Amino acid sequence: MAGLKRAVGIGAGIAALASACAAYAASPAIVAAIHARKANYKEIGGAFKTINDEIKTGSPDLATIRPLARDLLTRASGQLKYFPKGSGPVSGEKTRAKAAIWADQATFVKLHNDMLGAARLLQAATVSGDVAAMTSARTALGGACKSCHDKFRESD
């Protein structure tokens, strides 16, 4: 009889735990937003790396970096939609987004706007072909990204 009570107790405990875990499971929309966010950042990072590498040559291939700068700006412009409430650590999904994003939206949006301004400068500089302007805009964009990452992204 004691064995049966113990088995029932363990079963009830497992059921309660499973129920609690299910209550904290992220919705499909949140999971999709997190995956889209990661994919978007991967594309932004890849574009930035290629642009940066080209600028470092001193004679960047404009045919390569112009579309990348335009794509980077487009992707950055739509970035906030990938941060719906519940898509941070509370989701239970693997994400480097800190809860501070939702706790301090004003700062997050300000830093996002700083990044957009720098991305616009970079895109305009690639259109003009002015390497000095590209270098300056690239540095500003890297700094804007770093400012946000330092405050709102978990380290590797």
Summary of predicted features, one role per range:
Residues 156:
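Short Cys/His-rich "knuckle" micro-motifs
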